[in-house]
Structure formats: C-alpha cells, structure tokens
UniProtKB/Swiss-Prot annotation:
The modification Phosphoserine is found at residues 305, 332, 631, 634. Residues 253-265 have a biased composition (Basic and acidic residues). Residues 253-274, 320-367, 630-664 are annotated as: Disordered. This is Macoilin. One of its GO terms (molecular function) is microtubule binding. Keywords: Endoplasmic reticulum, Glycoprotein, Membrane, Nucleus, Phosphoprotein, Transmembrane, Transmembrane helix. Residues 320-348 have a biased composition (Polar residues). The chain crosses the membrane at residues 28-48, 75-95, 120-140, 154-174. Disulfide bonds: none annotated. It is found in: Rough endoplasmic reticulum membrane; Nucleus membrane. The lineage of its organism: Eukaryota, Metazoa, Chordata, Craniata, Vertebrata. Belongs to the macoilin family.
Amino acid sequence: MKRRNADCSKLRRPLKRNRITEGIYGSTFLYLKFLVVWALVLLADFVLEFRFEYLWPFWLFIRSVYDSFRYQGLAFSVFFVCVAFTSNIICLLFIPIQWLFFAASTYVWVQYVWHTERGVCLPTVSLWILFVYIEAAIRFKDLKNFHVDLCRPFAAHCIGYPVVTLGFGFKSYVSYKMRLRKQKEVQKENEFYMQLLQQALPPEQQMLQKQEKEAEEAAKGLPDMDSSILIHHNGGIPANKKLSTTLPEIEYREKGKEKDKDAKKHNLGINNNNILQPVDSKIQEIEYMENHINSKRLNNDLVGSTENLLKEDSCTASSKNYKNASGVVNSSPRSHSATNGSIPSSSSKNEKKQKCTSKSPSAHKDLMENCIPNNQLSKPDALVRLEQDIKKLKADLQASRQVEQELRSQISSLSSTERGIRSEMGQLRQENELLQNKLHNAVQMKQKDKQNISQLEKKLKAEQEARSFVEKQLMEEKKRKKLEEATAARAVAFAAASRGECTETLRNRIRELEAEGKKLTMDMKVKEDQIRELELKVQELRKYKENEKDTEVLMSALSAMQDKTQHLENSLSAETRIKLDLFSALGDAKRQLEIAQGQILQKDQEIKDLKQKIAEVMAVMPSITYSAATSPLSPVSPHYSSKFVETSPSGLDPNASVYQPLKK
C-alpha cells in the first residue's frame, strides 16, 4: 500500500467577510436590543438609585478567576485576585468621583457593544457616540441621586480590572514576540549547520544536487504557482534548501505544533470556523514525522552506499563510478519525494535496502542495469519525472480532500450529537430543578404541618388550663351558693314567723336562681362531655401525627379542630357572659335580702321595745284604758292581752290590782 500525505493548507475554509460592510448591511434587531437593554438599565439605575451596569465587569472578574483556578492553578488565581484588588484600590483612591463614574459607565457600555459579532461598523460607532454623549451631558453632573459610597468600589473595579487584563495581554504579546525571535535565531543556526553539512558532502553528491537545480530551473516552464504551492504545502523544503531539516529543528517544530494543538483543543468550542484546526495540526505533525523518517532513511542509504563502495576494492573505477551513480540516481528520487513530503512504498524500500547491503552478482547486475551516468541525465527526463510527481500529488490531493470530507461529515455528526446531548442535559436539568422545587415545597408543607400541630397543642393546653380554672371557679361558686343558701334558709326560718308575704318574692327569686344554677350545671356537664370528645379527637390526631401517612387528612382534621375550637371559644364566651349576668342577679338578690332582713330586724327591735314599754305602763296603770282612736295596734280589745305575756320578758304581774314590787 502506498501512503499518502494530505494537503492541509489547501483545505477549503469559508472566506472571512469584511466586518465593516457586514455591520453596515446587518440587521437592526441586534442594535434595537442593545438600545432596549441600555434604556432598561438606565431606568433601573434611576428607580433603584444604583448603577447596575457596574455588576457586569464584576461578573467577568469572577469568571476569569474561576477559569484561572481551573486551568492555571490556585497560585496564579490568588496572584490575579491580589493584582486586581490593588488596581481597584489605586483607582478608588486616586481618581476623582465624577471622572471615576464617567469612565466606568462609558467603558462598560463601549465594551458591551464591542463584544458583539459585528465589530467596528457604523451602528456600533453611533451607539458609542450616543452612550458617551448621555454619560457626559446628563449623568456626569447628576450624582446626587445615587448611593455614591456603594457604587464607588464597583466603579473602581470597572476601571481597575480592564487595566489588569490589558497588562496581562501586553505581557503575553511581549512573550510571543520573544518566542518568535528565539525561533528565528534557532532557524538561522540550523541553516548555518545545514550549510556546513552540505559542504561536508562528497563532490559527486554536490554535482547531483547541481543537476537537480538545473532540472528544477528547466521545469520552470510549467506553471510556477502550482509547483511552488504543491512543494510548499506538502511539507517539503524550497529549492535553495538542498536537503531536509535536521532533527533538532524538526523536534522543536513538533513541540510547537503540539502546543498549538493543545491550545486549539482548548478553544475548540468557541467558533465553528475553527473546528478543523486540530485536524490540520495532526496532519502537519504526520508530515513532519514523515519528513524526518525520509531524511533518516536517505542519510542511512547514502552512508550504506559509501561503505559498500569502500569495501569493494576488486571492482574497476568504471564499476565504482556506476555504483556511485546508481546510488545517487536511486537516492535522488527518494530525496525528491522527501522534499515533496511523500513516503515511498514498502517494496521500494526493501529493494533499495537489498541493493545497498547485498554483494551478490545478481544484485550487482541489477544495479549496473538501473544506473545511469551523470552526463546522460537530460532535461526532458526531469520534466517527465516532475509531471509524474505532479500527477501523484494531484492524486494525493484528491485523497486528502476525500479524507477532509469524511472528517467534516464526522465533525458535523459529532456536533449534531453534541447538540442533542446538550438539549437532553438541559431537559434533565429542568426536570431536576422541578423535582427539587417539589421536594422543597413538600418539606415546607411538612414544616407548616408541624408548626400547626404544635400551635394546636398549645391551644389545647391553654383550653385545658382555662377549663381547670373555670372548674375551680364553679366549685367556689357552688360553695358560695351553698353558704348563701344556708344563710338564706336561716334568715327565712328566722323571719318566717314575723314576715309573711314580703319574703315570698325573694323565695321565688331564689327558686329561679336555683333552677338557673341547675341548668348551668347541666350545661357544664354537656360541655365536659364535649371536651372529652375533643380530647379523644386530639388523641386521634396525635396518632395521625405519629403515622404521617396523609397530610390532607391532617389538614382537614386540623381545620375541623380549628372550627370546633372556635365554636367552643364562642360558647365559652357566651357562658361566661351568662355567668356574669347570673352573678349580678345573685348580687342584687343578696342586697335585697340583706335590706329586707335589716328592715325585719329593725321592726322586731321596735316591737320588742314597744312590748316592754306597754308592759311597764300596764303594770303601773292597769285601770287606764284607751279608746279605739288612740290604739294603733288593737282598736277593739284593750291594751292588756295574753299575747304579751307569752312574749314579754318583763317579770311584773299584770293581773295584780295594786303594784307590788318583786320579793327577792
């Protein structure tokens, strides 16, 4: 099989359009979007009194710190943060406030428009002029409407961070120029050493190189551009360089290509136009390796041929010349193919190795037949060889183009699969976010249920305490009622003889109050039964809480409990009002009873006094009688009566005719 080299430099790439014309004839939707974003940010700045455009450089700084930590390590990221911080402090301390805000806002908006795909064009320049005019004419003077102390560090960062990035860019540019200079120096040294090596070659090979030069000059009748492009792009050396490059130069170039390949692989996803760059670098590396192998084989063949010539002393001078000529002629196409970047087939390699190493007469005859003297090499033969090489190179170009098309199809398929994977990743992320939101909502609902249950437990404890307090009050009221009933019974028994109809109303009132008290006790029993039922329901709810099988059942039970507790609170408030009314009625009845008892006691005292006075008077003057008009007590009968004897505490005898003092 014949190995072919791909012509990497002639890969078809899309032509770069001029950015200015593309910006002029581009769509206006992008610039309308810029204007809308700018207007919205200015409106937010005016409403919230904060400059939100200063947050964009801060976000860029965070991204650059993350990238530096990811690709260059912790030390470089810390160094970068320190440098940016010192730059921000310098800008904060040494730049005036108005100029600081003006420069920061202007830089942010100009940089925002600069980062578009259009580049420098008429709409972007007009937008820059508009932004600078608004910042200089309106916002440069009105700093009172903003939080200056809060916005000032961000404004300093908007100026300090670009200064740091420009410094790093300048440093990379200087290092790149120094590297190019070093490469040129190494290239000059390699060329010098190559010239020394060429001068150290035998004169016969120098004559062969001169003949090759003449053949190349004769081939200039063909199209110069095609031959030069083919020779140059196939990895060969131009005509002024006689042989291939040395090993150190090839290794240096391979290292540089590997570095470029790593950098291109790192930036592969930035632009779709740069997708084929790693493929080009790989093909170029293969070309350099093939050139290196060809140069090695060429040198080995030359050394082997010279050794064979020195060993064969028995041959004549003509045979030596023929052998040298055959070695040179056989090596010249090889060197030519090496300069063109192609590698000979395995069969040709084996034949040449056998010709250089074998000493058999058959091999010697083949060499003598294939060799041609130097003076017999004519220019038309060189032209024929060049045409054959051109045909081979065209075939190689077609093969490389086919390989390029296959690679592009693979890249397109890989890009489509990557897009599908990205869309799937986006869907999976959305599903993950939805699941996380559902979990968060479920956790929140669980916490709310726990809080509601704890609140209900607190309310139940408060209700139980209120219930115990009410029961204590009821017991005290019952005791008070019993004491009041006992005192009332005593008062009624004491005043039953003297008072007939005045206490009937009070007795009826007491009976009514007793009936109301019985009703209240019945109501209290009913309420106690309800409270017991509620306690049972609370126990059931606690069981539901321990199980936590269904939150909806808990919520419905909690709502029912809330309604019932509200109803109980309302009923308890009504009961307390009724009790207060009953207590007020009892107090009024007690007052009336006390007043009536006081009146009865006063009347009894008056009756006793009158009885004593009457007994004394009747004892002193028994013959005196009173008429009906003067007697307020008994108008028909006399003042003396047997009724007074029963109740009189006096020791006088009312039946005595004459007053006699008592004998001791």
